[in-house]
Amino acid sequence: YMNNLTYIYKFYNGKSCHIFEISNDYNEIQTLKPEHEFHNFSAIWSKYIDLSESSKNDLPPDEENVYITSPPNYESGYSLSRYYTLPAFNRNYKTTSMFSQSDNCAPTAAVNLCYYWYSRNPEKYASLKQDPRWTNVHDDFYNLMNTHDGSGTSDFSIASAYEDYFNQVGLSCKATLHFTTDFGQKIVDELDNSRPVHLILHDNRTYGEHSVLALGYYQFEYNGSGNSTYIRIADGFSESPNRYVWGGCAGYWNYVTVIPK
């Protein structure tokens, strides 16, 4: 990148090189080799916006009912990879279908966050659990978040619900709503503090509008072209936390940090 333009070099069989010059409006592309002409500019650009053909096997699935369970299947040519999960994360989590209400993904994610802290330190966080099935905890969050059948939960109602619930059971926490995640990097930063994250997916092709609990990550670093980040989640549909969401997927993410005191 220089002079307000991006230059892409593509090598063919180690013998020839095509140089593409892309202007910063993302709509114009031209080769610097006059014998090669491209007319479908947007199609060419879309090939490179996804971290390039040379650095990935296939793009991660980004469609309905297709789940990511093995991020390395979609990455190659990286210089470094990092894998991390929270301590004591691997257990069976609650799903939305375990509770009677509908459009209840945010309360379910909140139950799973409380369940995580309770399981990690049952002495300190004993009061987070009210009943064996966590039904009362779910119902409390459903009400505290002003969740409604048909419309779900507003992002703006989640943080205050955590603080209210922790206070209600004799504990305290600092909960904060954050906007966007820098392709998942901000979730990585928070997980590195050894805390789960309430992750809110918007316009996601697999999950639509959905809340999940972030428990770990897989991150691949490419020299000169940034990172590709996958967040490991308890998604509220499967009890096992073995699915991931990709930081480069369609839509956008907000998130709530919850710091017990």
Can you say where each PLM-predicted feature lies in the sequence?
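Tryptophan-centric aromatic hotspots in well-structured domains and transmembrane helices
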Residues: Y1, Y7, N104-A106, D203, ...
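Exposed beta-strand-loop-beta-strand "reactive/processing" segments of non-cytosolic proteins
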Residues: Y1-I22
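Active-site-adjacent structural segments surrounding the nucleophilic cysteine of cysteine proteases
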Residues: N4, D25-S151
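Tryptophan-centered motif/residue detector
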Residues: Y7-Y9, W117, F237
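Ser/Thr- (and often Asn-) enriched beta-sheet segments in non-cytosolic proteins
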Residues: I8, S16, S172-T176, Q219, ...
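Active-site signature of cysteine proteases
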Residues: G14, S23-K33, G184-K186, D192-N193, ...
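Predominantly the structural core of cysteine protease catalytic domains
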Residues: D103, N112, N143-E221, S225-N227
